[in-house]
Amino acid sequence: MNADYKIIHYGLIGHPLGHSYSQAFFTKLFEEEKTAESYSNFDLDHLDSSTLDALVNGDPNLAGCNVTSPYKEAILPFLASLSPEAAAAEAVNCLRIERTADGYRLHGYNTDIRGFALAVADMTDRLDHGQGALILGTGGAAKAAAVALDLRGVPHTFVSRTHRAADTILYTDITTEIIANNPLIINATPAGMFPQVDTEPSFPYSLLDNRCMVFDMIYNPAQTLFMQKAAAAGAEARGGLEMLHIQALESLKIWRNN
């Protein structure tokens, strides 16, 4: 083997990572493309400068990482730059690692935004003028969904378990009128994600009907309890696997163009 030969490494930062399909997706892709690239899971029980230094400095061939829960917002203080999309979302799911003479610099991106936008494009196209979306959750995934909806001119309201704000209501505030005005409902919470498959958002499913569309950003399991209950009420229900694939390929474009 050529002494200059090296395998470029990527990975996923988060905790826990038992639910993730990313490693399997990228491994299969690299095998099919016959490229010298690999992808690993980096399950970090905490995130600080020391854990990042150990990760990045410990592998000189590590060129980029995806970031998942609970670190999409916690990673921000450690970044040298943010893409405009990531800055708008105040959340990052993709890191590009720049090697420098004195160490490294981390650059943050948000490919969830494009992944979500494309995965729900036909749903947003079916909204009547003035209709909007309810985004369940207020974390990094919810912020990415909000930016994507803003770019498509779709009004939206966050739904929280604990606090109200100018753009946020409680689950107990949801009424038939609110659903009629916001027939697209997005689950951007981890409720229902493997292994906690018996959990769900505290949503009033009885208010849904066949005019409603729900999108769950979770992809494991393929049919969450949220989706099952929404479908039983008559709503169209879709999971997040297509979004996962799109954001993964968008991340790979960023890393390969490094």
Predicted feature residues:
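Glycine-rich adenosine-cofactor-binding loop
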Residues: G14, G108-I113, V120-T124, H129-D150
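Residues in the short beta-alpha loop(s) of Rossmann-like NAD(P)-binding domains
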Residues: P16, T162, N220
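Short glycine-rich anion-binding loops that position phosphate/pyrophosphate groups of nucleotides
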Residues: V67-A74, A141, P190-M193, N220
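Phosphate/diphosphate ligand-binding glycine-rich loop within oxidoreductases
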Residues: N2-M123
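Conserved hydrophobic helix-helix packing surfaces used for dimerization/oligomerization
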Residues: Y10, G132-A133, V214
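NAD(P)-binding Rossmann-fold cofactor-contacting core
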Residues: L151-T168
